[in-house]
Amino acid sequence: MRPNLFRLLAVCAALLFGQPAIAQTPPAAPSSGLAIATFAGGCFWCMEEPFDKIDGVFSAYSGYMGGKTKNPTYEQVSRGGTGHAEVVQITYDPAKVPYNRLLDTFWVNIDPVDKAGQFCDRGDVYRPEIFVHTEEQRKQAEASKAKLDGSKQLPWPVAVPVTDASTFTKAEDYHQKFYKKSVAHYKSYRAGCGRDARLEALWGKNATAPKTQ
C-alpha cells in the first residue's frame, strides 16, 4: 500500500527543504533494568511523540516489524507485500514507568476498532498491533484489551491483536523524530489525515488514558 497523498507530500517537502539535524543512534539491547515495548499504531511519526514525553522512557524509534522480508526499506514496506507494520519500539525503565502506562498511552493514540489501517492511512502496513516481548507483557496487554472492551467506551469491539514480537528493523533516519525535525509538515499531515479529530471523537479533547476504571 503506497503512502497517502498527505504523507507523501510531507516526506517530499521535508527532504526537499531540509531538516534540522538531530543525532540518531541505532537501538541497542536494553541495559540492565531496562525493558523494550513495541506498538503499531498507524503512522510511526505520530506514535513516537506521545511515548517520548513519558518520564522513564529512554528512547522511542520508528521501524518495521511483523513481516518476513529481511532488513526492509520504507519503499518496500509502503508498497505492501512484506507483511511488516510500521511500529515504534520503546526502551523504558519499568521502575519509573510500568508497562500498563505504556498500554494506556498506546490506546488513546490509536483507533482501536479499525483493524484495516489507521485514520487516512489504509492497508496492512498501518494496522494496529501490540507486539509483546515477554509473557508478562502478553498477560498485561490481553488484560488491558479486555478491560477496554468491557468498558463499552468504544462504538465497536477492540480489533487490535496481541502478537509475539519479531525482528525489529529501524526505519531510515529521516523518519526518526519527524515530529521535531519537520514540525509544520508533521502538523499538516496529522490534520489532513484526520488523526486528531478522530482521537478527540473517541477519547475526548484532553484524554491521556482510556476510561477503563
Where is each model-derived feature located?
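Flexible coil/turn and secondary-structure edge motifs
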Residues: 2-5, 12, 16, 20-213
